[in-house]
Design a protein with these regions (language model features):
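Active-site-adjacent beta->alpha loops and helix N-cap segments on the catalytic face
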Residues: 38-41, 64-80, 95-99, 118-131, ...
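N-terminal capping/lid subdomain adjacent to the active-site entrance of alpha/beta enzymes
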Residues: 1-86, 91-100, 104-108, 231-266
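Hydrophobic faces of well-ordered beta-strands that scaffold small-molecule active sites
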Residues: 27-33, 56-60, 84-90, 114-115, ...
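Shared catalytic-loop signature of beta/alpha-barrel
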Residues: 104, 110, 121-248
Length: 266
């Protein structure tokens, strides 16, 4: 009943025409400039290139060495300015106590969210981090396989941003309950999309969540150009956001030429 009420209420504010829907640009962020191992010069070049393309949200990897992390965050923050957004992802590398300590050192860079700072199954560990730093945002979800784990994270207030993975979870039938749970608790959903075909999947989920489920003001999704040239209808990015797809289907049909080229028998 609650789910039906959420959807029925949201349907009242649907776009009045397909033209309104088709002109929607869904905001995205890029990790293209922030991978570990990049030199300062390469990071600077890539950040400047992405700024020129209209990107306003940047994510970078951290976790190898905190002093290097501080240096990299300072570099990127100075390049993007104070109006653009910066996020960090440590890919589960820190313990809970290390996370608490390191967040204290990175706060100065006005981080929008800290992604997967520790073990992605540790609901209570995330809660301990939140209790230590109630003023920061934690994000996780790309390793979560089902709606029950998301329910536990959200109900315990252990995360601030819900990062569903369209392939990790068992189909859209399991994803929709997660979107509805997040909506009930007013938790933003920012899908994970680093992986072949993930951007093509999530562009549809973003619009379903925006127009039919969520009432949250924050709209954002990850983008990574992962082998998009092999898809018949790849996700299109303009001015730092997803252009609404207009072709039918889930956009993940691989080109016959690519299948033939990379087929095991060939």
């Amino acid at each position: 009943d609650e789910a039906a009420k959420i959807i029925d209420q949201k349907k009242l504010s649907l776009p009045s025409s397909l033209d309104d829907l088709n002109t929607t640009i869904f905001p995205a962020y890029t990790t293209a400039a922030g991978w570990l191992g990049y030199s300062d010069e390469k990071m600077k070049r890539l950040v400047e290139e992405n700024l020129s393309k209209g990107w306003t949200h940047f994510k970078m990897k951290v976790g190898q060495d905190i002093e290097r992390d501080i240096h990299r965050c300072k570099l990127v923050r100075e390049l993007i300015g104070n109006k653009n957004k910066l996020m960090v992802d440590s890919n589960q590398i820190w313990s809970v106590n290390e996370t608490i300590e390191n967040i204290g050192k990175l706060k100065q860079f006005d981080i929008l969210f800290y992604e997967e700072p520790t073990n992605p199954d540790d609901v209570l560990g995330f809660k301990k981090i939140k209790d230590a730093h109630p003023d920061v945002n934690l994000a996780t979800g790309e390793m979560i396989q089902n709606k029950v784990m998301f329910k536990q994270f959200i109900e315990h207030k252990s995360l601030d941003y819900c990062q569903i993975d369209s392939c990790r979870i068992a189909s859209i039938n399991e994803i929709l309950p997660v979107l509805l749970i997040a909506s009930k608790f007013n938790t933003p959903v920012i899908p994970h999309a680093v992986g072949v075909g993930l951007c093509e999947y999530v562009q549809h989920l973003n619009l379903i969540n925006k127009f039919i489920i969520s009432n949250h003001d924050l709209l954002l999704s990850e983008y990574a150009e992962s082998c998009s040239e092999h898809f018949e209808n790849p996700a299109i990015i303009r001015d730092g956001g997803y252009v609404t797809p207009t072709n039918p289907g889930y956009s993940v049909k691989i080109k016959d030429s690519s299948l033939n080229e990379f087929d095991y028998n060939n």
